[in-house]
Amino acid sequence: AMYRAMALYLLNHGVNGDSQEEIETACSGADISIEYKNGEQIVILNGENVNSMLRTEQVGNMASKSSANAKVRAHLLKLQRTLAEKNDVVMDGRDIGTTILPNAEVKIYLTASADTRAKRRALEYEQKGEPFDFNQILKDIIERDERDMNREVSPLKQADDAVLVDSSEMGIDDVVNAILNVYKEKVQK
């Protein structure tokens, strides 16, 4: 969520996602924090709750581009580690188990096929009554995966000690149960 918040900040400030220089110049103006209220995680960007603005394709694509920037990564790495030190957390992200929290007690590499993820994203848009182009969603997901797997700084990859959970053919309850089983197995050892 922090990378998405940074991406939202960059988009709101007209930053060109293909310009590493613009990203580096702008990123220091983003004050990102996480709060917890009634068991819900709330992402705060410069004093504003931005949870409802983080799940768009534009934000996801900018997050992928800006996350390749070493200055952005350094800025957010400190925030993420501090959050984990002060709280019991469940973090998701494309390099949590390899870079952010390499010593985490439980690591899960949750994945699904690009087609499955595109269908899920399209369903989100449909449920919100928002227009979407399935082929564009799929194309964006494939491009983002490629970009993230091949970036120089902290590429997307499964940590050696992470358990793979492929949710392509699973419903939400099945995914939750699979993750809980991994957690129980790791913690009860």
PLM regions and their residue ranges:
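ATP-dependent NMP and nucleoside kinases share a basic, alpha-helical "lid"
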Residues: 51-60, 67-128
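Anionic, Ser/Thr-rich low-complexity intrinsically disordered regions
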Residues: 95-100, 108-119, 128-140, 144-153, ...
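Conserved, well-folded catalytic cores of nucleic-acid-processing
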Residues: 12-13, 33, 69, 83-86, ...
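Residue-level signature of catalytic and energy-coupling elements of molecular machines
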Residues: 47, 76, 90, 141, ...
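Active-site phosphate-binding and catalytic loops of NTP-dependent enzymes
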Residues: 18-20, 35, 88, 147-154
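Glycine/charge-rich, flexible interdomain linkers and switch-proximal surface loops
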Residues: 26, 41-42, 46, 91-93, ...
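NTP-dependent small-molecule kinase module
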Residues: 44-51, 60, 122-128, 146-189
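N-terminal phosphate/diphosphate-binding loop that engages ATP/GTP or pyrophosphate donors
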Residues: 1-56
